[in-house]
């Protein structure tokens, strides 16, 4: 095992999470693949290759919520063309492309509605006991393993939408249940594509409970890596112990990341989080963690590119100090150097603390949602700024606004060689201040 870098440095997300343009009036997840998005993806691959993040893991290459019934004509010729361009571009840069894959849930809504016997009552999860359910899961895996798509592996998720709770399935603990379907799926993939990387992300599945370790160990024997979303194992001091007990690499989602808001203009927010993420990744490395699924960011927002670059640098060079990763990212995004870079680095650190010191969000708890992922009042329009409304008191928001105004005034006086990055940063700060004012 390479001890100079994370073994599985994966950047991931839904197809449009890195898009420079929002889809304001589409329900989440929108997987529209146009030429502008393809250009954004190629740009992202360039930065990914520059920083040595080997794997790109995409959800939504083929579907949004459900595989079709009957299982045919999954994508049209134009989408297949874009997929080939994307896969070829990744391979030309020495990168590998993974597919985000639901196991028994996520991707099977239409199957459950139309195919008798795959579910025992759940509208979102198929039943472990059903032969018809396995037949559909196997079809999906066989489809993905077809070499024509240019994929290099999968990351499996089985728990973020719950599980079957029929009398037979409910006799199993959550970990037992998910282990059964994950191991069966991974073994099928390993037999069909021994060259593939197989990951597993524990959205909705706890990995920190001592009684469940035996089940995690079974999973670890058939996958290459697994990641814990909320870092409970670190919070209770068990992560190092868990790492030592597994046969695969173990990791996280990088401590903190801003969940890219599908419906929002890319300059509507300014929430740097790179130091929090870099420090969390350094702690993961110290605990023996060697895997991370580090989420896509839209580089149209300079603060997001800086944050992503910082975590990516830790993944490829874990002994890098977070502050050094920040300076390197600022040089790349803003074109600053020397004393100007030091000044901007201090400014960015204060900008990050300005939000997180007043917010009830805790690093290690996964994603920070700016808008509701699915706004129940209207899922196809931009949602309210819940990262401000629900995570800060009115007094905290007022203090935050005053500090942002002071930071903006400082930034306006700084010499920034990249004029476009400067303009976009000021616009993003302005967007945040408008949000705060709307909540007053």
Residue ranges of each PLM-predicted region?
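Substrate-binding groove of N-acetylhexosamine-processing glycoside hydrolases
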Residues: 1-4, 9-10, 27, 37, ...
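Feature activates predominantly on carbohydrate-active enzymes
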Residues: 1-138, 142, 146-151, 190, ...
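Short acidic, glycine/serine/threonine-rich loops at helix termini
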Residues: 68-69, 109-115, 119, 166-169, ...
């Amino acid at each position: 095992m390479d001890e100079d870098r994370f073994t599985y440095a994966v950047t991931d997300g839904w197809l449009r999470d890195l898009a420079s343009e929002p889809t304001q009036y589409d329900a989440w997840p929108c997987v529209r693949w146009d030429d502008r998005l393809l250009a954004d993806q190629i740009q992202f691959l360039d930065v990914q290759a520059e920083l040595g993040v080997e794997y790109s893991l995409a959800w939504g290459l083929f579907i949004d919520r459900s595989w079709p019934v009957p299982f045919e004509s999954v994508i049209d010729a134009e989408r297949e063309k874009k997929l080939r361009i994307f896969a070829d571009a990744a391979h030309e840069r020495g990168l590998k492309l993974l597919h985000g894959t639901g196991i028994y849930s996520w991707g099977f809504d239409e199957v459950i509605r139309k195919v008798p016997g795959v579910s025992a009552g759940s509208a979102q999860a198929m039943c472990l006991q059903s032969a018809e359910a396995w037949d559909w899961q196997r079809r999906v895996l066989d489809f993905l393993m077809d070499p024509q798509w240019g994929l290099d592996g999968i990351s499996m998720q089985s728990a973020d939408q719950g599980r079957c709770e029929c009398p037979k399935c409910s006799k199993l603990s959550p970990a037992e249940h998910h282990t059964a379907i994950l191991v069966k799926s991974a073994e099928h993939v390993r037999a069909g594509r021994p060259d593939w990387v197989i990951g597993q992300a524990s959205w909705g599945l706890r990995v920190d409970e001592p009684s469940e370790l035996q089940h995690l160990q079974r999973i670890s024997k058939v996958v290459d890596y697994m990641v814990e979303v909320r870092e409970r194992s670190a919070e209770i001091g068990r992560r190092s112990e868990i790492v030592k007990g597994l046969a695969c690499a173990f990791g996280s989602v990088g401590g903190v990341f801003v969940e890219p808001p599908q419906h929002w203009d890319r300059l509507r927010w300014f929430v740097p989080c790179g130091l929090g993420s870099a420090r969390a990744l350094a702690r993961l490395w110290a605990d023996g963690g060697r895997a991370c699924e580090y989420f896509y960011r839209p580089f149209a927002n300079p603060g997001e590119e800086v944050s992503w670059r910082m975590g990516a640098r830790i993944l490829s060079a874990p002994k890098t100090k977070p502050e050094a990763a920040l300076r390197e990212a600022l040089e790349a995004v803003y074109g600053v150097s020397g004393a100007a870079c030091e000044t901007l680095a201090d400014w960015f650190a204060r900008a990050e603390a300005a939000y997180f010191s007043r917010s009830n969000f805790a690093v290690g708890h996964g994603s920070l949602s700016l808008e509701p992922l699915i706004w129940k009042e209207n899922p196809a329009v931009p949602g309210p700024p819940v990262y401000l409304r629900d995570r800060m008191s009115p007094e905290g928001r007022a203090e935050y606004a005053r500090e942002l105004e002071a930071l903006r005034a400082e930034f306006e006086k700084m010499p920034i060689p990249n004029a476009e990055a400067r303009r976009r940063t000021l616009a993003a700060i302005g967007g945040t201040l408008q949000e705060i004012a709307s909540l007053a």
